[in-house]
Structure formats: structure tokens, C-alpha cells
Amino acid sequence: MPSEAPLSVLALNASLKHEPSLSNTGELASLVLDEMRALAPISASVFRLSDAKLPVGLGFRESAEDDWPDLVTKIRDADIVLFCTPIWWGGRSSLMQRLIERLDALDEEYSSTGRSAIKGKVAGIVITGSEDGALSVMGSIMMVMTWMGFMLPPECAAYWVGEVGQPTSQDRDKRLRNMATMHMAKGLAQSLVYYARLLKAHPQRFVAGKATCCEMHANLEAPA
């Protein structure tokens, strides 16, 4: 029996910290990747947004130094994409917001051509923070991902938040001992692997036809 081809996993770390600094977000993402490795062969890579050049804009290439085209290639090649962000003042980090804004170019590609680099890919979410906001950030990212065409499985997120008023220097030790976060990481890994395998075995097919939602899309042919 032939061996199973590894699942390609891309973790997008939107921590504001630069390499080689440790981040709670990066370490929780690594825990999820380790849980996935225990379930299936994977080929995993981590892209740290803070060390990339991703200028403001909605185009495919905003400058000669723009790293976005290379990142799009990584996203296209991935079976699973992990969106990993810390919480800043109750919301996702500015780097996660920048990523979402740049992804809009791929969403517009689908609207205008009927082809998508992201539709049907399995996505998961990793969130860390010092006090609160995890569920709010999770919900807002889930809304964006599902409308862009990512497939969100059950238990699609893992998070950890620290205790109100306590020194952030204690966050890492507390997170590493938090059984609930470990349980969420395991559940997230199981869901991602299961649904990525399912979609590889049964790829999503688009029904051929023309969109009728508006004049702009009147001649849009969906791929067969």
C-alpha cells in the first residue's frame, strides 16, 4: 500500500515580535503542528509576518520589495492554513489585519474570474492574549475566512488568554500548563487533519453556470 502523501500546512504568525524572539502565538501554533504530526504526515512551514515586507495595498504586488507574491504561492500550495494572531486592545494584531486586507485581492480574483487560490482550503485559527478578547477575535476572523472560501471545520480554533491584572511575564509558564488550551490544540489538529484528508480524497467541484447577482458578474462562468 503506497504511503500517504504529507499534508502541506502553512502557519501565518501575526505576532508583532521578530525572530528569534519567542511569542505565545508562535508557541501555541507549534503545539498545534506537533499534534498534527502525531496524526498524519505533514510538511509544515511557519511564515512570520513581522519579518516580511507587506506594504499597504490591495494589489498583487505593491512594490518591488513586496513579499506578497511569494506568500500567495505558499498559500496556494498549502492544504491547511493556520491564521495565528495575538490580541491587541481587544482585536487582532495589525499584521493579521494587513494579511486580511491583502487577501482581498484573491477574493476579487474569484469574483471576476470564477477561479480561486483559497476556496476550499482548510483553515484554523490560533489566538493568544494577556486578558480577554479571544472569542471576539475568533469570530471576526471566522467571518472573513468563510466568506473568502476557506473551509472551517468544527473546533477550528485554539486559544489562550492570561489572567486580568497579572504580570505578562508569567503568561508563558501559565499557558504551557493550561490543560484546556492543550485540549483545544489537540481538537483543532484532529479537525484540520480529518477535513484536509477528506477534501483531498473528494475535491470540491464548482457547478458550471453564470452568476446572476449583478451586472458586473453577469458573464461570469464558474469552472466545471
Can you annotate each of these PLM segments?
Residues 24, 59-60, 138, 152-153, ...:
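Surface-exposed beta-strand edges and their flanking turn/coil or helix-capping segments
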Residues 148-156, 160-161, 167-180:
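Conserved anion/nucleotide-ligand pocket segment
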Residues 114-160:
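Short, glycine-/small-residue-rich phosphate/pyrophosphate-handling segment
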Residues 16, 130, 159-162, 210:
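Glycine-rich beta-alpha junction loops
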Residues 19-20, 132-133, 163-167:
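A short beta-to-alpha transition loop/helix N-cap that caps and shapes the active-site region
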